Swiss-Prot record:
Belongs to the alpha-carbonic anhydrase family. GO terms for molecular function: carbonate dehydratase activity; zinc ion binding. InterPro entries: CA_dom, CA_dom_sf, Carbonic_anhydrase_a-class, Carbonic_anhydrase_a-class_CS. Its main location: mitochondrion. Residues 1-38 form a transit peptide. The gene is CA5A. Transmembrane segments: none annotated. Its cofactor is Zn(2+). Zn(2+) binds at residues 130, 132, 155. Keywords: Disease variant, Lyase, Metal-binding, Mitochondrion, Transit peptide, Zinc. It is found in: Mitochondrion. Mitochondrial carbonic anhydrase that catalyzes the reversible conversion of carbon dioxide to bicarbonate/HCO3. Mitochondria are impermeable to HCO3, and thus this intramitochondrial carbonic anhydrase is pivotal in providing HCO3 for multiple mitochondrial enzymes that catalyze the formation of essential metabolites of intermediary metabolism in the urea and Krebs cycles. It holds the Pfam family Carb_anhydrase. This is Carbonic anhydrase 5A, mitochondrial.
Amino acid sequence: MLGRNTWKTSAFSFLVEQMWAPLWSRSMRPGRWCSQRSCAWQTSNNTLHPLWTVPVSVPGGTRQSPINIQWRDSVYDPQLKPLRVSYEAASCLYIWNTGYLFQVEFDDATEASGISGGPLENHYRLKQFHFHWGAVNEGGSEHTVDGHAYPAELHLVHWNSVKYQNYKEAVVGENGLAVIGVFLKLGAHHQTLQRLVDILPEIKHKDARAAMRPFDPSTLLPTCWDYWTYAGSLTTPPLTESVTWIIQKEPVEVAPSQLSAFRTLLFSALGEEEKMMVNNYRPLQPLMNRKVWASFQATNEGTRS
């Protein structure tokens, strides 16, 4: 599917292993590329990861992610509750290079770290968080706002511990996952992010892993808790439509040097031809008949930070 053996043994193998090979037994069919002007830069960039050089979606999929969020078209819902976030720093386990991105894993055996409230009816346990980024600062986020792509995007992935026994079940279950998305923009140095940046040289190659001291990921969240929410999917195979997305309106600032450090990682394993870990985002998907709900009312001010 990906063409070169080096890609098959790196990013693609990771995706299959992480998302459970049995799910790939479902037939996959080409999906249409996003036709919106908003994704022109992202999809015209010819250095997309090979996983996305051929459009892929799930058969009959109607709620694929990521999407372009039209600020003015989002619908204010006064019944949306504040999101409650409670993360236990000690539940942080390790950081590793998956072959597609770098990921920080958490102990999800208890309710110690998780979220509730917002658009969610149940408690969701934190499983992991990771980032997506581009080769250049003009794009790299998976979601966009009014056609604007940010340099990177943080995803905190949670699973419904009330309805399901474990993460694997939740991935394929209704209302199984909740993902908080946070945009990164260039600006001031981010002190907490630097803790991750300092470890990246230890996980340069695929499958490399490093221990983590206690880490509270709430320190990576913006100070403003306004958000958009919509029904979507995973943005990596198996692309299951089990995700409630919670996209924070306010981006967080990171220094250019910190984002550049992300680009020092490799898709490839030690001994393989080196492939820079950049452009690890999925192209935009059509909104179709979905609505994007907002926890805040639109104003006459600028549409983005």
